Amino acid sequence: TSLNIFGYNTIKSKGGLSVYSSEYMRKGKETLMADQMIFKRCEIKYMLDITQAELLKNQMKQYMTADEHGMSTICSLYFDTPDYLLIQRSMEHPVYKEKLRLRSYGTADKDTTVFVELKKKYESVVYKRRIAMTEDEAERYLLFHEKVKDTQITREIDYCLKNYKKLSPAVMLSYEREAFYAKDDHEFRITFDQNILWRNYDLSLCKGIYGEAILDKNKVLMEVKTAGAIPLWMVHFLTENQIYKTSFSKYATAYRTIYAREQRRSCPPENFFVFTGDEVVQQAIKC
């Protein structure tokens, strides 16, 4: 093991890099395996139109099974610094990046079970840690730093909260998702996201599902989630239909809109008049 710059011990394994605190490592493997609620996988995104998505779903019937919950509505409340440091760093495509969010399935109320998630990406491998609690408990934990059960995951979340000063709700995202998993390998999953909405006001999972659309109605964001290789039938479909991976990020797309609007508000129009005594001088300003 070796200590990395984020304060965690890293363990090289066949599947890649796992990250744990030095204190937790001393507790031994049995505790490590029993307590963790960690997802480790590669996530590959593709932008499809509705026709392509339906063609793929039809072909998937032979190899995959629809999730028993069917179409679900996912709400994610992303936390960031006042100057959006986390998403700005993420958009620079660093070797390591992380996001902190609060997730619910549908609109929550104070007693709804929600998930505090710390999503990390290291060398293209995604590590997601999450803990379940009520929406009220999550709000008091993330905003007011009230104590919760001490686990490896909460320590990593605490480290994130301490490392990035003044983290608070920044963007609310919601979308409808269809999920499928392979019949012979439940770790291979495909999801289809539509009706992706965002807002940077009313920042609560309890406020409802509304906001501005990120994608055209004809577009579908597909994510392939796997701990191994993509099956050949899937590779053939993508090749035949000229579908290529994309680095599309819901949060980053919303942030670009926020940033562009802030720039327009802080920038004078391209041409404006400056009055200097009896003279009128036209200025051409480029933002």
Q: At which residue positions do the language-model features occur?
A:
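Extreme N-terminal basic, low-complexity initiation segments
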Residues: 2-9
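Phosphate-end processing signature that detects enzymes handling 5′-triphosphorylated RNA
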Residues: 6, 15, 19-287
